[in-house]
A protein has these predicted regions:
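C-terminal anion-handling pockets and recognition modules
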Residues: 1, 119-174
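Extended, low-complexity cationic-aromatic segments
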Residues: 1-68, 168-174
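Acidic/histidine-rich, metal-coordinating catalytic segments
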Residues: 5-6, 76-89, 110-113, 118
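Short aromatic-enriched loop/helix-cap "lid" or pocket-rim segments at secondary-structure transitions
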Residues: 13-16, 93-94, 119-122
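Short glycine/proline- and charge-enriched loop/turn segments
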Residues: 19-24, 102-106, 124-130
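RNase H-like polynucleotidyl transferase catalytic core
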Residues: 25-31, 100-119, 135-136
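Single, function-defining residue in the core of a domain
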Residues: 63-68, 72, 80-81, 85, ...
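Short, aromatic/basic amphipathic alpha-helical patches
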Residues: 91-101
């Protein structure tokens, strides 16, 4: 079983904690920009984390590329659990399944408006509010590097990844 979800990472930092001397407002020197990275992530039951980073919003062909990446790295048949993003239901994914991927891949959509049922959401929370807290980036290339570094650190924290799977609200029976 593999849990898949998408997230956006912006140049604006996710402030968790800040400090300034009494009477002085803390100021962060970051550009106001809507530039962002879109990230597709997959978390397996044994704590393997697969990530795909791109500079644009996730569309159907991007999902297909990620599914090919996933199939190349996870052996055997896969039950894939994800949300109801329109890119997941698009023609590109349907064509990919019809081309033979359905032999190894079974798709299961989560109920609408139930992101807490997807353990991958816990991965995003950990990345944004623990690994990347208070990180200020001025360019997408810098943000991409910081996100990659945070992901690599997280890959070694298998207890955190497994904790995302064991979270309340997500019961998995083997």
């Amino acid at each position: 079983m593999v849990f898949v979800d998408e997230a956006g990472f912006r140049l604006l930092p996710g402030l968790v904690l800040t400090y300034a001397p009494r009477g002085q407002t803390p100021i962060l020197d970051v550009p106001f920009s809507r530039d962002h990275l879109s990230v597709i992530g997959a978390l397996t039951l044994d704590g393997m984390l697969l990530i795909w980073i791109q500079n644009h919003s996730v569309k159907g062909p991007d999902v297909v590329r990620f599914l090919k990446h996933l199939l190349a790295r996870v052996p055997g048949k896969i039950m894939l659990v994800w949300d109801n993003l329109s890119a997941h239901r698009g023609q590109a994914v349907k064509d990919f399944l019809a081309s033979g991927a359905a032999k190894r891949l079974t798709l299961q959509a989560l109920p609408s408006y139930a992101p807490d049922l997807n353990p991958q959401e816990g991965v995003w929370r950990f990345l944004k509010y623990v690994e990347l807290k208070n990180i200020c980036c001025h360019h997408l290339a810098e943000l991409r590097l910081e996100v990659r570094r945070a992901i690599e650190r997280l890959r070694f924290k298998v207890d955190v990844l497994l904790g995302c799977i064991r979270q309340p609200g997500c019961v998995i029976q083997s």
